[in-house]
């Protein structure tokens, strides 16, 4: 009974967020972390597109039509191009949607200075790893 009640509560929350069909670019170089966040987001009927480093993320945003992505979850420490540099590059793209696209840092580093640096690079917020479901839902409620 308790498990059933928790399941029903989870489903009600997912439906109330109205995220079905939203498209999120998840930028994460660690396969296990990518799998975890993808599974969490797919539970909300979100379309997840993966990128495995910052350069790949910038290239995907560049190649996409305006308004294609609803949100970007961006790891910070990655090879090739880190998340902060990728956020700066996305913000420089000459498209209005690239200035407005929500970019949320995902990082195990959650000190005030880390959050400040993420925001200074053009990101809109910061989620600490491991992902807190309440905070994830707060972010998802805004797309």
Regions found by a protein language model. Give the residues of each.
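Helix N-cap/capping motif at the beta->alpha junctions
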Residues: 29, 50-62, 83-86
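Receiver (REC) domain active-site loop signature in two-component systems and cognate sites
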Residues: 78-81, 123
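Charged docking surfaces used in two-component/phosphorelay signaling
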Residues: 35-43
């Amino acid at each position: 009974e308790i498990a059933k009640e928790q399941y029903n509560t989870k489903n009600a929350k997912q439906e109330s967020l109205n995220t079905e069909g939203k498209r999120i670019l998840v930028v994460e170089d660690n396969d296990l972390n990518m799998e975890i966040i993808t599974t969490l987001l797919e539970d909300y009927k979100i379309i997840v597109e993966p990128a495995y480093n910052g350069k790949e993320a910038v290239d995907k945003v560049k190649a996409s039509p305006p308004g294609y992505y609803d949100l970007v979850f961006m790891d910070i420490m990655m090879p090739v191009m880190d998340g902060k540099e990728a956020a700066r590059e996305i913000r420089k793209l000459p498209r209005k949607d690239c200035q407005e696209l929500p970019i949320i840092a995902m990082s195990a580093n959650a000190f005030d200075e880390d959050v400040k640096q993420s925001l200074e690079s053009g990101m809109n917020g910061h989620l600490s790893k491991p992902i807190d479901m309440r905070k994830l839902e707060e972010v998802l409620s805004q797309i």
